[in-house]
Amino acid sequence: MVRSLYIILVASLLFASCTRREKSKDTTSLSFLSNSLRTTPVKDQGKVEACWIYAYLACIETERIENYGDSMNLSPIWLVRNLLQEQASESYLSQGTMPVSVRGIGPDAERLLKEYGMVQWSTYCPDDLNSRALARLVKQKVGIAIKHRKGLNILNKEVDKALPFIPHNLRQGFYLYSAHYTPKQFGGSLLYGIKMTWLTSYKHHPYGKRFVLEVPDNHRRHAIMNEPINDIYSKVIEALQNHHPVYWEGQMPRKKKPSIDGDLASLRQKALERFITTDQHAMAIVGLTKNKQGDTLFICKNSWGKQWGMNGYCLMSKEDFLINTILVGVVDKN
């Protein structure tokens, strides 16, 4: 049984960044993984600030395995690349006022997959990328293009060459299980029958209505349904019990559990407004387990490589979930 509830995180976790941490291997027993939903191998995002893409695709991968019987290892960098190309055009037309960054939130990963499709990890997995360096390079090219009024066609070609190389045949499509797919067709097939419901819980907006979540990385101003946190907790438990993974975004667990004594909604609101809870990281919740005291723990699949945590996984307590969750994505059963 699990001996320890928490991964002791380094002080840098106080900063809002989702890139890979220094190695912090936890030697806790891995027996809890027997309670996990089936997943693909843990990925390592390295210096790519796109945990939200990694977490979302991890959910799609597990959903496909558990409920459709097919194992697909998907390429987060495919969406990162398309996002930067998209932002280059937007930044150019806005004369440099639109941001160029790979930071975002879960609903935008869903949007990108629908818009640009997907390819397999084995066909597009460039190594040692630094998303901040790529964003700076794109911004530089946008700035030059604006200065010389080059137009979108020339800019798009220059940005395309600057980003990680895509084999020509991959652009045209690929074969999988004897069927030919373009990236767009493959993305559509992955999402067939899968729809996420995005949920958050804060008092400064009425429950039962959507609102544009005011976090720094919600560049697209996605509106999220607002519900009481206990209702969200129950939906997450139910989803996992029915073999559906859950997308999670929020503040990573700290050494000390947060208190849930008192009005939960007020505790959450205070943590948000004082920036104790930030939209720091995203993971896929892929199962439930219990400690020796019988407390429920969430099994979280991270994207910081297998050398981090417990073979790339960590455990989240009920208290951490109730206080530190910014938003979740639950598969819509309807």
Task: Identify what each model region corresponds to.
Residues 73-177:
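Papain-like cysteine protease catalytic cores
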Residues 56-65, 114-118, 241, 290:
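Sec-exported extracytoplasmic/periplasmic mature domains
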Residues 21-22, 35, 40, 155-334:
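Active-site signature of cysteine proteases
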